[in-house]
From Swiss-Prot:
Mg(2+) 1 binds at S59, D60, D61, D309. Belongs to the ADP-ribosylglycohydrolase family. Monomer. This is ADP-ribosylhydrolase ARH1. Keywords: Hydrolase, Magnesium, Metal-binding.
Length: 353
């Protein structure tokens, strides 16, 4: 099992980046807000299995996910989380030098440059009511690879929140990072996906408790807390998985057009997956429906009219943890940009866990 789990760690990092590259298509598909057009173009390319990602660059999502992973590795088994936070801030700032042609989000760019990693608490930024975007969620999955054990839940909560609010200091933003990390840990532990949402609902009070204990912009955070929780509660009830036991139910038909409409309906501003609540939600919806099919996952999470590279990066990671490279066309990842770096960080995270 150990060797198999290491392989799944590798798949998690690599397929997250592969999903990102596929959903991004050098910017063409991230910003094409019509899923049916994307699926037509995909068919013209010969379908998913025919795509060779050699010239398909990864976006800001993977660059920042690698920054998170490499900061976790540099910190090692350190128990002082403030040291880790300074390293995260440094890596987030440094990775901004690798954003040419990768369409980085505004909040990530602006706030990364405000960070002062060498100063005490220089990794903190003020609360901002406009920072509910998905930039925190898209880079946090590997935190669940580093802290997968139930005994490490407090660390997972704290690190995902603080990594998130270095650039997205708003609950809708940084709680997205918590979901990305938490569901990765669930996947490592073989928890059935229909139980994940219920697990999140049980963890959110712990997250709120941490926000209060941290004593940093507590009032503002609590004032804006309910949107994220309400949206997830509504979604879990819609899919019939509020109890954490039932199988999810999907409407019929639920094809490309219907999915675009649904993704837009759960979004904050109409662009599905562009916020911290709905990027992991759309990824989760795809995981619930796709089972062990990489192609079905891609059709739902990578190729749609919303913020497709972010939902793809998150979904690709969770799916990779569960299924490894099962049924994935090698052309989708063999010549992937940064593949060696992704594999090295995955193996090192496995050793560190």
């Amino acid at each position: 099992m150990c060797g198999a789990l290491m392989e799944r760690y590798v798949a998690a990092m690599v397929l997250s980046a592969a999903g990102d590259a596929l959903g991004y298509f050098n910017g063409k598909w991230e910003f094409l807000q019509n899923g049916e057009k994307i699926h037509r173009q995909l068919a013209q390319l010969g379908g998913l299995d025919a795509i060779d990602v050699e010239r398909w660059r990864v976006s800001d999502d993977t660059v920042m996910h690698l920054a998170t992973a490499e900061a976790l590795l540099e910190a090692g088994k350190v128990s002082d989380l403030t040291h880790l936070y300074s390293l995260l801030a440094k890596h987030y700032q440094d990775c901004m030098g690798d954003m040419d042609g990768r369409a980085p989000g505004g909040a990530s760019v602006q706030n990364a440059m405000l960070l002062e990693p060498d100063k005490a608490d220089g990794w903190r930024i003020p609360f901002n009511s406009h920072e509910g975007g998905c930039g925190a969620a898209m880079r946090a999955m590997c935190i669940g690879l580093r802290f997968p054990h139930s005994s490490q839940l407090d660390s997972l909560i704290q690190v995902s929140i603080e990594s998130g609010r270095m650039t997205h200091h708003h609950p809708t933003g940084y709680l997205g990072a918590l979901v990305s990390a938490l569901f990765t840990a669930y996947a490592v532990n073989g928890k059935p996906p229909q139980q994940w949402g219920r697990g999140l609902m049980e963890v959110l009070p712990e997250a709120k408790k941490y926000i209060v204990q941290s004593g940093f912009f507590v009032e503002q955070n609590l004032q804006h807390w309910s949107y994220f929780q309400d949206q997830w509660e509504k979604y879990l009830k819609l899919r019939g998985i509020w109890d954490g036991k039932s199988a999810p139910t999907f409407p019929k038909p639920f094809d490309v057009k219907e999915r675009d409409q649904f993704y837009s309906s759960v979004s904050y501003s109409g662009w599905g997956g562009s916020s911290g609540h709905d990027a992991p939600m759309i990824a989760y919806d795809a995981i619930l429906a796709a089972g062990d099919s990489w192609k079905e996952l891609a059709h739902r999470a990578f190729f749609h009219g919303g913020d497709s590279d972010s939902t793809a990066a998150i979904a690709g990671c969770w799916w990779g943890v569960m299924y490894g490279f099962k049924g994935v066309s090698p052309s989708n990842y063999e010549k992937l940009e940064y593949r060696n770096r992704l594999e090295e960080t995955a193996r090192a995270l496995y050793s560190l866990r």
